[in-house]
Amino acid sequence: GYPEQIKAWENIPTDDYLLKAKDLAANFDASAICKTVHDSGMKYLMITSKHHDGFAMWDTKTTDYNIVKQSNYGKDPMKELSTECNKLGVKLAFYFSIIDWTKQTPEPYGNVNPIDEDLMTTVIKPQLTELLTNYGPIAELWFDMGGPTAEQSQRMAQWVHELQPETMVNSRVWNKAGDFEVGGDNSVT
């Protein structure tokens, strides 16, 4: 399986995952990262804000399962990246997994994790709101995974555009609700 889906493939308990979280970001340096991005001529920096395992890489109010509360680092790396990107004129973009395996049964074998209304209203919308209101202009929201309904896909794209009209949304918000099309994993289009 995919290493980024190991929590589901190997049924790793969340408590075991948290043991590893303590040492996250020990050598994190937002200034050096953004300088490298800038000096290499890249126009934007895309960072994973939350992957399928549900661990948030920012100071979210929706769960204590985040880098600020669970790591020795204790700071918000998204805030630091936002500050450094702005200093250098680099655009910031977020990858955001629609699914959250702390809130639903993992289905790693296919993209069929249904999104229930509770997840939409208590996790997805509040987390998107935090990401799009606490870190300045966001160039792109890269959604991934999940099996939302067409109506849910439209709502997620709408939430993004209501908060930041210029933010691009990729096609992995599903159901033709994105602003541009992307290919599949491990494929060339």
Predicted features along the sequence, with ranges:
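Mature catalytic domains of secreted/periplasmic carbohydrate-active enzymes
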Residues: 1-189
